[in-house]
Amino acid sequence: MSSFTHFNEQGRAKMVDITHKEDTVRVAVAQTSVTVSREIYEKMTSNAIEKGDVLAVAQVAGVMAAKKTADLIPMCHPLMLKGVDIAFAWENDGEAHKLVITATVKTKGSTGVEMEALTAASVCALTVYDMCKALDKGMVIGPTYLVEKTGGKSGHYRRKTD
């Protein structure tokens, strides 16, 4: 079990010691989507959802989620984030209306921010679902994935596109 860094000698979970790692600028970009009905799309784009401005609330929820990642994911280190940005884009194809959510998280530190970016994107999507579920519970979230990460010993990663 010694090849897994999140396990101690007894095979129990531990938080990895990162004191020896060099501080570098770290950036992670994660993406997810929410596919919604035409009714939800029309109401969201005209800001007519009863609970309020869905994208504004989701954006704040995503930033908050990035900052709280270490409270949600047991082995994540609490990080001093330097920036969190949430972007939204619609992809419409006939009757399919997909809200693409992109979360970009930055820090300067000794561990990456991939989990923070993934958490931010996921909580944005969950917030959209929560605010729109009264209209249609058939919304589909995902897929959720890491698009890119830079910094650290493992270097640059960019997801291969389909």
UniProtKB/Swiss-Prot annotation:
The keyword Lyase is assigned to this record: yes
Binding, substrate: 75-77, 115-116
UniProt-annotated catalytic positions: 130
InterPro entries: MoaC, MoaC_bact/euk, MoaC_sf, MoCo_biosynth_MoaA/MoaC, Mopterin_CF_biosynth-C_dom
Keywords annotated in UniProt: Lyase, Molybdenum cofactor biosynthesis
GO molecular function, one term: cyclic pyranopterin monophosphate synthase activity
EC number from the UniProt entry: 4.6.1.17
Protein's GO biological process: Mo-molybdopterin cofactor biosynthetic process
Pathway info: Cofactor biosynthesis; molybdopterin biosynthesis
Pfam family, one: MoaC
Catalytic activity: (8S)-3',8-cyclo-7,8-dihydroguanosine 5'-triphosphate = cyclic pyranopterin phosphate + diphosphate
Cited function: Catalyzes the conversion of (8S)-3',8-cyclo-7,8-dihydroguanosine 5'-triphosphate to cyclic pyranopterin monophosphate (cPMP).
Protein family membership: Belongs to the MoaC family.
Assembly and oligomerization: Homohexamer; trimer of dimers.
Protein's name according to its UniProt entry: Cyclic pyranopterin monophosphate synthase
Species whose genome carries this gene: Geobacillus kaustophilus (strain HTA426)
The encoding gene: moaC
